[in-house]
Swiss-Prot record:
The keyword RNA-binding applies. Residues 119-152 are annotated as: Disordered. Its EC number is 3.1.26.5. RNaseP catalyzes the removal of the 5'-leader sequence from pre-tRNA to produce the mature 5'-terminus. It can also cleave other RNA substrates such as 4.5S RNA. The protein component plays an auxiliary but essential role in vivo by binding to the 5'-leader sequence and broadening the substrate specificity of the ribozyme. GO terms for molecular function: 3'-tRNA processing endoribonuclease activity; ribonuclease P activity; tRNA binding. Keywords: Endonuclease, Hydrolase, Nuclease, RNA-binding, tRNA processing. This is Ribonuclease P protein component. GO terms for biological process: tRNA 5'-leader removal. The keyword Nuclease applies. The gene is rnpA.
Length: 152
């Protein structure tokens, strides 16, 4: 039995399933590409759903095609709560056959960020300091400590 966090599962409602749904996404979606895959996104009012197209041209062996799909489903499962709503369809390219699982995952996340469907991660050190901690001013010179003002 799957005891994973229910918010991290990949339920039927999170999938693009029918030919009509795929056609709607392909005909009206924004598209971005990468050497490993193409991502189509059709914004909608419902939570993010994922469709996968991994043909035999990508990998003639079912094991390889299933690995690519498994990695992409897992990436969606981990990031679904942060994603913009809508339908996403990934069309894998033949370069994905030789890519590592991490390369496939990173390519998927990179494409989501390019579509602005996933927020970009913050860089360490970019957060403002907590209240009560003085920060140097960029517009005023720093006060000199230990020197008295000149007499007039």
């Amino acid at each position: 039995m799957n005891t994973a966090d229910p918010r991290k599962r990949f339920p039927r409602s999170a999938r693009v399933r029918t030919r009509a749904e795929y056609s709607t996404v392909f005909n009206g979606a924004r598209r971005v590409s990468d050497p490993l895959m193409t991502l189509h996104w059709l914004p909608a009012d419902r939570p993010a759903r994922l469709g996968l197209a991994v043909s035999r041209k990508v990998d003639p062996h079912a094991v390889g095609r299933n690995r690519i799909k498994r990695v992409l489903r897992d990436a969606l499962r981990q990031t679904r709560t942060d994603m913009q709503p809508g339908d996403f369809v990934v069309v894998a390219r033949s370069a994905a056959r030789n890519a590592s699982n991490d390369d496939i995952r990173q390519a998927f996340l990179r494409l989501l960020r390019r579509l602005r469907a996933l927020p970009t991660p913050g860089v360490d050190g970019t957060m403002p300091p907590p209240d009560g901690i003085a920060t140097p001013s960029l517009t005023e010179p720093a006060p000199r400590s230990g020197t008295a003002e000149p007499a007039r």
